[in-house]
Structure formats: structure tokens, C-alpha cells
């Protein structure tokens, strides 16, 4: 304890600059926080959503963010302000004593992050601090571990031998602002050792400017701190190289050396957001509720600490009590996709720009031109995977692509912070909200109600009759006639504006966009047996009226749609109803909770074992669209649109103050909560009668002139609507025509498209034809029915007379070749009987070719010819090829070859020597049979192992394929045996006297094991018998 007090006294004596030991003691000392009840975190209230930030990309798809803060409840008690140090009341400039320069200390004092905010020096010391950073601070900064990916290159994969800068990098000129780090290219691979002592002074980040009057502005230099995470190169335009200390964009706010968090950490358990401890300036309670918990600004401190305000003490408190951060359930940040304008067509997509930023980085000793590689799935879609052009591998350069990059080309999903997020129906990325069956965004379908029915009334007079009203917000609409009819469905929007089949005109089937949805109008042919229908997905933004244009009785109309009905509001019997009823524009507003009494405690004591009531600010009214000072109230309506009969008027809404009831500007009310000015019916005096004409009927003819008819009624509009009146009331008015000529299109006409053909006969009477077709008004051929109403078609066939027929013999020239090569032969020619040039051959009426022509005058059709006497010649005569010698595989074929002599038409076999002067044809040729199957092959049996009493013979068995190679595909059941018994006769026990060796070579016979052969058994009987006796004694 004495040692600790001694160090504290030393800190108070030195005053400025704050020594490092005291700084460590202050930052790492015990936390004196306001105890809470059993470690519970007080419940907080979400503040209003901030404005959407600007789009992250100047063109193309980007990301917008907005955030809100968790505010401490106004009823939360604050800790007492500790007394100021006595030195604080001493006049400025007094009490200061010169400081002895010490090696680990420096006149430059950064702004460390502590429990009480940044530590501030007296005003007398401001501006006298040096800009150079001492070695002690450098050594303190090196305590931060240098992680892979901190120097502008990807974290995974990361290997120093593979990723390094160019060996001879281009060094641009000195940048204008040295603090930004732009234009610097690392000359060597990043290492875990800072190069400040080797390469000169450090780059100092620029001091952030304060955007708040409560943030102190210091002119001191800032301690350089390595960034925590890697930052990819800039992806807009030319990639900006990064210095050896990482991206200069990481220096935002006043950064000091990293300190371990105190036991009372201000971060949430999930680490989703950081809590800001309140400053300890004695301010009024009303200001504390607004200043203690401020939304994070663009230049907030990195670890979530707020600087002291101007009215704070010039000295700092070592013991700064704190309050646990409030806890709010829900999200603190929202993101949505944005697009200011499309990017130019020549600009590459964002992934291509991000990959191209690594073209100047060496990979495995050489440079590549990188292009996006998108053939990945799952979480890899938001990684920067690039493939070098012309190579078949890819590399993950960074774990996260730039925010706003599409997960996949052509997809609506967007990458944010390395995650692929899908936009919900509310436009927020990752919200997961989808419209339910009745179009409610994020609804669960509990409020959906199906409305359906059949309209079977026969209907009224001819013309437009309203049959159905559909409210706004309806979805899944379907209206259809039960059977085909001459009636038509029509739609009118607010104010009687026509959507489909209005103004006495029938629209064609198709898609029609109105009131926030697309209506599909379908009119099937009558033969399908279905009536016309209207359908839409919805939801509709305004109500719509459904009309029927009656021309006959109503065949029945089926309708159905889904509407969202609001849930019933349950009121407590003890709660008094408010004097001002909520207006429709207050959509799902949060009800005001009754204020709870604030606990009373004795002055100077801590408030323990008391829960903070969840009471919203009493002066704030929350609605679904945010906070607003007024509400929309209907104060009247416009003039009636019709001076007589039935019309419509529109309600008028004004913005009324919730407190005073006075009229406010429209900006004081939520624009999205303004009720729609839906038209309402109004009535005037009866209108003058008028003629109402019905729809014209179809034309009486499908083409050409026809007639149309229509019905004519005298109608008059009254307050309750229009009705038919006697025609006499319209007698003073000109009567419209009830008939009119019509012509859908011109009828077709007959056209001769080809001349007459030749007569079918060459003499006598025959037929000829021509092409006749029906041509429309545009010159194209149409169906013959189009010409049926016109004159009859011209004839397409007629008879023709070619004169009387005569018969005569006609013959051709003699053939050019004689039938014999030598000697006498024959020449032939054709002779036919024709009648006026037409042959009678094959004509059943003419009979044979000689009929009609005199046979005695028939010219001859053959004659003799001779090419000279014949000479004997010799030639080889070949017979047919024989069958292939092999059934399978390769084989041979042969044929017979003989020498033949020829004299005219006589052939004789002669000696082959007579044909020796001629090339002899081959008698053999190779042939290929069918594909050979694998077969078993075996060798000859070996000699018997014994001459008597049973021996064994063996042989080799192999499976060979068709090309005589070893195979294993032979049938196992057909495999021949490899062994068989032999010499089963008994042997003589002893050799008799007659068993003698008659050859001097018997010892060699025994050694050669030739006793198994009968010859040697007889010649060398005794020697072979001795061998037999020894073999019997040995085991088999």
C-alpha cells in the first residue's frame, strides 16, 4: 500500500507530462464503478434512427447505413461528482516545475483512453509539446501484435515468400499530404519489427477535426497505432499503394496505445456495438439525459470513449466512477442498397477493379493480371477470389470484398462486411422480412382475411352497372364470369378514372398497371366455355370499383381477394382513455406508458436494490414513421365533382398539433402516415335527361360492307344514381343512330396466278389447267371463304382438242458398238409405233405396239456387224476366294489361277507358260475372321514321375486371348486339368537274375532320370529297379 501511495504522490508531483508508470497505474488500476443490483444491466431505450448516410459508391450499387444509440433512461441516477484536485484551483502557470528529460518519457503526451475519457493536460502546457515520438512510446506501441494482412494485402492465404512487393518498385513523387499514406509503396515484405529506428521518423496521422463544441481540440501530435484489421487497396480508379504501416484510413480520431479493457467493460456481450461512458462534468439533470448518451458521430473514438467537454476540470480524476451501459434489444444499425447513377459502360465491375488492384503485387515471384473468379458457393461469394488471366488457378486475396459488391452477377444479394445479405421487403439488407399472403411486410398472415362470393343478380338496364367495391390493400384478386356472355367487366379507380373497358370502349386482353399493381385481363374464346376474368397479385394502394357492361342477363360473377384486417386493440379496464383519439395516420404507434414514481434515496448514498422503470420520455410520441409533432385530421371535403346527379368529393386533411390543436405545416406530420384522399360519393339536383347508347353489335358480315346495331335508352341522373326514363323526355334531343354501316376489312377476290398448261394429249381431246387463288386486300393468299361472298371463281380446268391422231413407225439410230469384239456380231436399234408423236406402248386402249401400224412395213431392229477376224489371246483366269482358314483372328484365303486362251467366243485352258508374259494375280491373301474369344491352351504331358505303383504327369495350362497374350477371362469350368495319374501297375519287389544292366551308361540314365521310359527300364533294369526301391522308401 505504501508503495502504491508513493507512486501516486510521484504522479501528482510531476503533473505534466504524465509519466508512463502513472499512466499504466491509472489505466490498469481497479475500476470504481457504480454497483448495480446483482450485476444486472439496466434496460435502455432506443433513440431515433439517424439519417441514412450517403451512398458508399458514386455510381452503380452501393450501401447506405443508418444507426441508432441505446440511451440511458432519464430516471437513471447519476454518480456524485468527485471533488476537484486542489491543484486545479491554483492559477495557471504556478506550481509547475521543470521536468528532467528521461529516456522512457517524452514531452509529447498522446491521448490515452481511460475510464474517464481522454486525459487532458493543463492549458498552459498546450502547444509546447514536441512532435517527435520518443523511443519509449515506440516500444510501447510494438506491444500490439502484427497480424497477417495488416499491410494492405490479403490475410488468407498469406505467406511472405509468396506475397511481396516488386523488387524495383516505382517511387512516385512526394505526396502532398504525408499523413494520408498515399503514394507510398513498401520496398520490402512486411515484418513484425517496426522500421522507425532504421528508416527515419514515422508518418504521423492527421489530427481529426472536432465536429462538436464539446470535443477538445489539441494541437499535439498523435501516437501512431497499427490498424487492427487489414484494409484492402482502394478500388476506385488506380489502386492506391499502402505504406508499411497499413492503410492510412485507419487513423480516425485520437488513437492512443492499446489498453486492456477494465473489468467493467462497456462492450456488449456479443460485441455488436460499443457503449460510451458518460463524461463527469457537473451539468444539469436535463442536459445529462441528452449528453451522456450521444449517437456516434463520424469522428468518434475507436474504442467508444467520449472526450471531456470544455467545462470539465483541467486535471483528470484517477478514480472516475462509471455507470453500466444500458442494454437494448434489437439492431443498432441498418443497411440498404443504393444506386446514385449507373456506372459508365466502359468501367469494369467492382470485382474486376478490386482484383486489378493486386496487379502490382508479386505472387510466387511474378506479376499477374487478375480477374474475378466467381465459380464459388456459400460464404466464399463475398471473398475476393481472383484468377490470373491465362492460368487455371485462383487465389483468395482478401476475406471480404468491398461493401456493395454483388454476391453473384445478376443477383440482388449484396456483400456487406463479408456477408451476403438479401434485401427484405422493407428494403433493409439482412432484415429477412417478407410480405405475407395479404401483402403486409414482415407479417405472419394472422391478419389476412379471405373475402369471396358470387354475384348472381340478373342485373339492371344496359350499360355500366357497379357490381363490386374492393378496398385498398387487397391482394390476390380474382374476378371472373361463370360462363361466356356478351357482357364485359370494367374497372374504375379513384375519381371514376377508367382502368379497363372505360369510356364505352372495349380494351384488348393484356396487362394493365394501376393503383400499385398489375391487372391481367383475360377474354378466352367462347368455345372454351369460360367467361372473361380479371386478376392481380396486389396489394392495391387505392380502392377500386368493378363494373359490368350489361348487354344481356348476368351469367354470374365470382370474386375473391385477401385483405389485412387490423388486430383488435385490448384496453386495460384501469387505464383511462386518452382525450385525443389516435388518428389513422398513427400506424401502430407505441402507447404511452404511465410514469412510475422515482425511488427516493438519502443524499450522499448509492442507490442499491432498485430496478429502473422502463418509462419513455413523456414528451415524445412514437409512431411507425418516427417522431412527429402533429397528426393528420380531416377538416372537410372539396366541392362535389358533379353539378347535378351523383358525383364525388375528396376529404381534406390538415396537420394538427398534438398539444395545442392548432394547424401546423405539413412537414410537422409524417408524410407516409397521411391518409389517402379517397373519393366519397356526393349528390346534387337531377341532371337533364340524355340519350345513352349501348355497345355496337358485331358487324353483320365478316368482310365487305355490313351493318351494326345498338340499343338506345333515355336516361336521367338523380341523386341516388342514373335510371332509365320514358323516351319522350329525350324527344327534344337529337336521336342518335341505332344502325351504322361497318366493314371489318375488304373481302378477297379471285386471281389467276398462272397461264394454261399444255394439253394432256398430243392428238385428240384432252384437258388443260391453271392456278386460281383467293387473294386478300394486301395481296396475300387467304382462305377461299373470304371470296365466297364475291363473284364465282374463274375456271381452273378446261377441255382441249389437239386434232385427229395418225400412226407411223419410228426408229432410233443403230447402236455404236458391235456385240462381238472380233468376227461377226449384231447391232441394235429401237423401233416403236407412235400416234402423232405419242407412243402406244403401255396404253391399255391402244393394245400392242404393232396395233395401228402395218407389220410388213416395220423397219428391222437389228443387223450384222464385223470388226475383223479374231486372233488368239491368252489371259489369266482367277477363281473365287476360298473361306478364311481361321474361324477367328487372322487367317489366309486362296484361289485357283489358270491360263486361258481365247479365240473369238471360244475359251480353252492352256499351259501357264503361255501367260508368263502377263502379271500373275496373287493366289493367297490374308483374311480376318471373327474376334477370337479367350481360350485355354495346354502343353504336352510330362513323363510319368514313377515307372510303377502310380505316378503323376503334369502339364502347363494358360489362358490366352485372341492375340496370343495372357488373359484372365477364360471360363474357369472349362479349364483343363494340370495333373493326371500314370503307371499304376505294381512294381517287382526284388530284381531277378534276368534283371541286369545291358548298357554301360546306366548310371547316366539314372542321373538323367530316364527310368520312366520303358526302353531304359529294360536296358538298365537293375539300376532302375534300385532307384525304384529308394523311391518307395521315401514319402510321396
From Swiss-Prot:
Signal sequence annotation: 1-24
GO MF assignments: protease binding
Domain TSP type-1 positions: 47-91, 687-748, 750-804, 805-871, 872-931, 932-988
Residues with glycosylation annotation: 454, 737
Ranges of biased composition (kind: Basic residues): 163-173
A biological process from GO: apoptotic process
Compartments (UniProt record): Secreted, Extracellular space, Extracellular matrix
Keyword Zinc-finger attached: no
Ranges for domain PLAC: 991-1028
Keywords carried by this UniProt record: Apoptosis, Extracellular matrix, Glycoprotein, Repeat, Secreted, Signal
A GO CC annotation given for this chain: extracellular region
Tissue: Widely expressed in a range of tissues. Especially prevalent in brain, spinal cord, muscle, lung and heart.
PTM annotation, UniProt: Glycosylated. Can be O-fucosylated by POFUT2 on a serine or a threonine residue found within the consensus sequence C1-X(2)-(S/T)-C2-G of the TSP type-1 repeat domains where C1 and C2 are the first and second cysteine residue of the repeat, respectively. Fucosylated repeats can then be further glycosylated by the addition of a beta-1,3-glucose residue by the glucosyltransferase, B3GALTL. Fucosylation mediates the efficient secretion of ADAMTS family members.
Record-linked SMART domains: TSP1
Region feature (Disordered): 73-149, 163-308
Compositionally skewed regions (Polar residues) per UniProt: 215-253
Subunit structure: Interacts with CTSB. Interacts with FBN1.
Physiological role: Positive regulation of apoptosis. May facilitate FBN1 microfibril biogenesis.
Protein's recorded name: ADAMTS-like protein 4
Species whose genome carries this gene: Mus musculus (Mouse)
